[in-house]
């Protein structure tokens, strides 16, 4: 297994997870009336593997933290997230993985499609929703004024 990423393999149960980081992500980005249920599902072995479906549409996210993002290839997305956060490691909640991952790998996974939240810490993240028609919804997630927002994100 590539040591640059920790991958949740659903048939192996719950790997070592970072409960504090998961709660932080949910509290910072998810609307209040959905937080408790999602946190419970993340901590439940049987429910954890399907929790990502809560993130299929951006209406579950707090509106004040959403900054629409244009299409970016993996390299550009990594550059933008690194410039804002200064970190090469992130926490990912996605369709096939939940856990710590190198930023480059997380951006490549997002670029391939699929629902995901990439969290770089300090209230900085990226969201990609489910693709129904056209491009999937994509947003930079910025809690408060945690960093300088690039002119084009």
Predicted regions and their residues:
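Structured alpha/beta or helical-core interaction and ligand-binding surfaces enriched in interleaved
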Residues: 1-134, 139-153
